[in-house]
Curated annotation (Swiss-Prot):
SMART domains: RhoGEF. Residues 320-330 have a biased composition (Basic and acidic residues). Residues 114-216, 259-333, 429-460, 484-508, 604-639, 1084-1155 are annotated as: Disordered. GO terms for molecular function: guanyl-nucleotide exchange factor activity. It comes from the Eukaryota. Residues 192-257 form a coiled coil. Keywords: Coiled coil, Guanine-nucleotide releasing factor. Residues 304-319 have a biased composition (Polar residues). Residues 700-874 form the DH domain. InterPro entries: DBL_dom_sf, DH_dom, DZR, RhoGEF_domain. This is RhoGEF domain-containing protein gxcJ. GTPase-activating protein.
């Protein structure tokens, strides 16, 4: 087949270009073989590999250089794609019998040799522990630490097997409880045995360190050299079997306990007397043992875990608190079915004087231990260590072999299992609370008691970082049982102990004796007749417990011994009150307090937690053991109590007392009382409603006083900023005239307000007195407010020059300006003077009428309003005069008019359409009427209609208001949105002018052409008339205080505009006719009234005289001294109002007559 030469040459060119990929367009380099391939191909021509971007997730082949997968929309950026080296193969799963998450990780599997060494170490530790238990009965703390060391090693190897750890703890606890009972009762102490135990402890520590090295070696094993998991199981099985064997031995010991045998008081008392006599020697030896135990704990227990110790009730209370802190034992008498709820609260070391409830972190622990364990009577918590107290029946029957195991199991199953609550609270110590009531044993005058309580030689004057030590209650056993029989629920008592870092509170539920009533609780044993020795022992333990807190002590206080004499008790009561005041107050949510009844028994707590409830919502927080004053009949059997209790405070009464104190403090208007409130209450309320009203009013008053102080301070700082940032630097660039025109008397205002603020924060004057005294000085604001508009015009003219503009730009970068310009600062004096009456009125409303500052506030409000009214009227006069001068200069054809007459002032101006060719009798179409647009100027006695040409006005006509009448026209000739009114001259041949409203609105002359200033509040919706201090009897229509910006009245609709003009002209006409009928004498006399009264006392054109009467009533009723001249003025005003009503009816009848 012949091929055309042109086609052959074209194909050769194409082939050459495909080979020379770098010189071709639309070619991409293959990532595999790095050869060029056209982009149109999906595979490489050389190696057939993919050219496009393949998704690393769904393996979809996308376009070249695409950023996202078309199918799964995943990002295809190279940085987001994981490298191949980072993806490791999935390890092969090997089934093993032990469900341990740690053993699956092969990096920590020990070798066979290491397992054998661990077993040998464990056997050695167990042998050492057995030797220590046999040789030393008094040093149970060393044995306990050795056992804990072994347990820590076991738990580190089999960390996941939680049940085995629990069983191990249970087994060790049984040995500990036996050792405790023997140590407490025993009389001998062998120092040689202590040394042997210390050596054993050191040996055990060495073994433990060797076991710890196993973990370091195991974590550094290579992943490639793995041994089978079955090889690591054998040491664990041996450990578990060893634990189970020890558990069986302990169960035999527990089964040997006798059944509910009645407690023999003689045995327990003999044991206690033995301990009492040897307490001094035991304390010395225990101190040596505690040092050794502390070293063992530091070496082995890296992560502190609170454990449980077991001890008897009476000796555990007598023991040194240092020993209790360092014992870490695990009880064996916790039942399987018990649900233990733990609330952890973490205490912070803080020296602030208030108590704050911390956050709670709650969880629940179910202790799965042996069901045949003995019952728990009470718990004592110390630094996270729980000490269980065994009943006296259990203590007395340890050596008795006559028992029935079935009966024991049945009795234990019938008893309700208590619930244990552990809480560690985040507290801020110490709260400043009111002094608690005096303890009864200090106030009671017991003549028959001969007991002397010897307190410690040095106690703390203020305890900042600690809470009270565990208290001991001692009472008659028989009286206790009699009272407990009458209780409806099982009582509970708690003993709270804390250190500087942890606060632990526990609630202990005491189990009843099976042979007595369930309500009878065995908690306190009879004391020996020799009370002096037992109390001395208690005082020694208390002294040791307080000495353990030396790290947080700052001051010490010596207390003399408390005897039966009343004088010594009273002398020491104040010292004890100082100690009690330093303790934190009880929690506000659950103020459950165990109290002693009059017969000496322990009162049951009605709010104790329910054992069947698994949650810990109803946790009983027994704060302290309280004192009870015995009756005269029981003085012989009364036994004193030694305790450092938490203050027992009724929080509801305390809150009410604080509220009453606050109400009393807020009743005083002194500023110093607001900042530093007094602690004494001067007023009390009889009912809850009155108390609530006083508190609400006092809170509002306090907020208002704070607002006045803070805003005044900010205002003084702003005035100082104007002077230092703007005024003084500009004096170098501008003349003195320009500086006075811009800043006016700003420095004088700053001096006055600075003195005002100093008087407000003083301790001698009240708010009303300060403003009443400083009211005359505030008149300087009149000059500033009158020339404020001129100040803004001068500033705008100054900013037009480039040099000054750059200077102001540099000033705006200063931080004290807060991003505001000079205009924002110059308006602040105008705003502040108008805010004073508003703040004082609100403060007057929030002040009680019987308050001593109430009449002063009324007087201050009256004076400030009068000053503000004067400033407002003067400003209106100034603006009216300035506008009138502009009109005279720009008005043509009004040479004969005297617009600057003394009794004449401008009120309104705006646009109107003059209707030409309109008659009321003839109905004509709208097309035949002609409208001529013009501008009107309404004075108080004159109406002008002009035609505007640029900035000038040409007068078309004018008329006196006392010669015309006004009528509202209703005709079909005008649209519905057009309002028409007519002015008709009185008399034969009088002229008539008909006007129609336009789109433009009328405005009050007092705020026309201004950008900021003072405006009357009622003029925002209607252009009402105002008097600038005229003598024609026309007073100000509006209120005297307000703030405006710009021509705010230019947004009214057309109907309101026309109604405003119509109503204003009508009232002005009525006003002029009233002046004619009343005569010039009455007019001149009436004009003198506003000068002696408040600016609000003038009559308004709209007939609203309520402001007049209200202001008059305030001035007459509120002022403490009402003069006879004010009463005469009030009577004259009432006569004038009656005459106005009579004349107004006559004027309206004349105005409504149609010509």
């Amino acid at each position: 087949m012949l091929i055309h030469p042109f086609i052959q040459s074209f194909t050769e060119i194409i082939d050459n270009r495909m080979k020379l990929g770098n010189n071709m367009e639309g070619v991409i380099e293959c990532k595999n073989c790095q050869t060029d391939t056209p982009k149109c191909n999906k595979v490489c021509l050389t190696c057939n590999s993919d050219i496009g971007e393949r998704c690393w997730r769904c393996n979809y082949l996308g376009k070249i250089n695409s950023k996202f997968c078309f199918r799964c929309n995943v990002k295809l950026h190279p940085t987001s794609i994981p490298p191949k080296d980072s993806i490791q193969p999935i390890p092969i799963f090997t089934k093993h019998p032990i469900a341990s998450t740690l053993l699956i990780n092969k990096s920590i599997i020990p070798t066979q040799s290491e397992n054998n060494s661990i077993n040998d170490n464990n056997n050695n530790n167990n042998n050492n522990n057995n030797n220590n238990n046999n040789n030393n009965n008094n040093n149970n703390n060393n044995n306990n630490n050795n056992n804990n060391n072994t347990n820590n090693n076991d738990s580190k190897i089999i960390d996941a097997t939680i049940t085995n750890t629990k069983n191990n703890n249970t087994t060790n606890n049984n040995n500990i409880s036996n050792n405790n009972s023997s140590n407490i009762i025993s009389n001998s102490n062998n120092n040689n045995n202590n040394n042997n135990n210390n050596n054993n402890n050191n040996n055990n520590n060495n073994n433990n360190n060797n076991n710890l090295n196993f973990l370091k070696k195991s974590t550094s094993c290579d992943n490639g050299s793995f041994e089978s998991i079955s090889d690591s199981i054998s040491p664990i099985k041996d450990i578990i079997n060893n634990i189970n064997n020890r558990t069986k031995d302990i169960e035999k010991l527990n089964s040997a306990l006798p059944l509910n045998k009645k407690s023999n008081s003689s045995t327990s008392w003999s044991n206690f007397n033995t301990f009492k006599n040897n307490s001094k020697t035991n304390n010395n030896n225990n101190n040596n043992n505690n040092n050794n135990n502390n070293n063992n704990n530091n070496n082995n227990n890296n992560n502190y875990k609170p454990t449980i110790t077991s001890s008897q009730t009476q000796p555990s209370l007598m023991e040194n608190s240092k020993d209790i802190d360092k014992k870490e034992k695990i009880p064996s008498n916790i039942n399987n079915n018990r649900s233990t709820t733990i609330i952890y609260k973490y205490q912070e070391d803080n020296s602030e004087d208030y108590t704050d409830d911390g956050d709670f972190e709650e969880f629940q622990i179910n202790s799965n231990l042996t069901s045949e364990s003995s019952s728990i009577d009470s718990l004592i918590i110390k630094d996270g260590v729980i000490a269980t107290t065994v009943t006296s029946s259990t203590i007395n029957c340890i050596n008795d072999n006559n028992f029935d195991p079935d009966q024991l199991s049945s009795s234990t199953s019938s008893i309700k299992k208590p619930k244990l609550f552990y809480s560690i609270t985040k507290k801020k110590l110490v709260s400043q609370s009111p002094p608690p009531p005096q303890p009864p044993f200090l106030a009671s005058a017991s003549s028959s008691s001969t007991t002397t309580i010897t307190t410690t030689d040095s106690l703390e004057k203020s305890i900042k970082d600690s809470t009270p030590i565990a208290t001991t209650l001692v009472n008659d056993y028989q009286n206790q049982n009699q009272n407990l029989n009458n209780e409806s629920a099982a009582s509970s008592s708690s003993l709270s102990t804390t250190t500087t870092t942890t606060t632990t509170t526990t609630t202990t539920t005491l189990l009843p004796d099976s042979q007595t009533n369930l309500n009878n609780l065995i908690f306190i044993e009879k004391l020996n007749n020799d009370l002096s020795g037992s109390i001395e022992t208690l005082n020694n333990s208390l002294n040791n417990s307080l000495n353990s807190l030396n790290s947080s002590f700052n001051f010490r206080l010596n207390l003399n011994s408390i005897t039966n004499n009343e004088d010594k008790r009273l002398s020491n009561s104040s010292l004890l009150d100082e100690i009690i005041d330093a303790f934190p107050s009880p929690p506000s949510k659950n103020p459950y307090i165990s109290v002693l009844n009059t017969s000496g028994g322990i009162g049951s707590n009605s709010n104790s937690s329910n054992n069947n409830n698994s949650n810990s919502n109803n946790i009983t927080n027994s704060n302290s053991s309280s004192f009870s004053k015995k009756n005269s009949n029981n003085n012989n059997n009364y036994q004193p109590v030694i305790s450092l209790p938490i203050p027992i405070v009724n929080h509801q009464q305390q809150q009410q007392q604080q509220q009453l104190q606050t109400a009393a403090i807020l009743g005083n208007n002194n500023i110093n009382f607001i900042q530093n409130p007094s602690s004494t209450s001067t007023t009390t309320t009889t009912t809850t409603a009155s108390t609530t009203t006083i508190l609400i009013k006092s809170d509002h008053r306090t907020n208002l006083i704070k607002e006045i102080l803070t805003t005044e301070l900010d205002y003084v700082n702003d005035l100082e900023t104007i002077i230092n940032v703007f005024c003084k630097p500009l004096r170098d660039f501008i003349s003195n005239e320009d500086s006075a025109s811009i800043f006016s008397n700003i420095e004088q205002i700053w001096q006055i307000n600075k003195q005002l603020y100093e008087n407000l924060i003083s301790n001698t004057l009240t708010i009303g007195q300060v403003f009443s005294n400083m009211s005359d000085s505030l008149k300087v604001y009149s000059v500033y407010c009158n020339y404020h508009q001129k100040s803004l015009d001068s500033l705008n003219q100054l900013l037009k020059t480039p040099q000054n503009e750059s200077f102001f730009d540099q000033l705006l970068s200063k931080p004290e300006l807060r991003g505001m310009g000079p205009h924002s600062f110059l308006i602040k004096p105008v705003q502040r003077i108008c805010k004073y009456p508003l703040l004082l009125k609100e403060l007057l409303k929030a002040t009680a009428e019987d308050h001593f500052d109430y009449p002063q506030l009324i007087l201050a409000v009256e004076k400030i309003e009068k000053i503000v009214g004067t400033i407002n009227s003067q400003k209106k006069e100034m603006e009216t005069w300035q506008r009138t001068m502009q009109l005279i200069q720009n008005l043509k054809g009004a040479d004969n008019l005297q617009l600057l007459a003394a009794n004449r002032h401008l009120i309104l101006e705006g646009s109107l359409h003059l209707v030409i060719g309109f008659t009321e009798n003839a109905e004509k179409k709208n097309s035949s009427l002609k409208f001529k647009k013009g501008v009107y100027f309404l004075f108080n006695d004159l109406f002008l209609f002009t035609k505007q040409k640029g900035t000038t006005y040409k007068l078309l006509f004018y008329t006196q208001l006392d010669n015309v009448l006004i009528h509202a026209n209703v005709s079909n000739c005008f649209p519905a949105d057009k309002s028409v009114f007519s002015l008709v001259e009185i008399g034969v041949g009088g002229r008539k002018w008909t006007f129609c409203n336009t789109n433009s609105n009328s405005s009050n002359i007092s705020n026309s052409g201004n950008s900021s200033g003072i405006i009357n509040s009622s003029s925002s919706s209607s252009g009402s008339c105002s008097n600038g201090g005229n003598s024609s009897g026309y007073n100000n229509l509006n209120n005297t205080c307000g703030i405006y910006s710009g021509n705010s009245n230019n947004n009214n609709n057309n109907n309101n505009n026309n109604n405003n003009i119509f109503s204003t002209i009508q009232k002005l006409i009525e006003k002029t006719w009233e002046d004619k009928f009343m005569g010039q004498s009455s007019v001149s006399h009436r004009l003198s009234i506003p000068s002696t009264s408040s600016p609000n006392n003038g009559a308004s054109l709209n007939g609203n005289s309520s402001s007049n009467s209200s202001s008059t009533s305030i001035s007459t009723v509120g002022s403490p001294n009402v003069t006879s001249a004010a009463k005469q003025q009030q009577q004259l005003q009432q006569q004038q109002q009656s005459s106005k009503k009579r004349n107004r009816r006559l004027v309206k009848s004349l105005v409504n007559i149609k010509t």
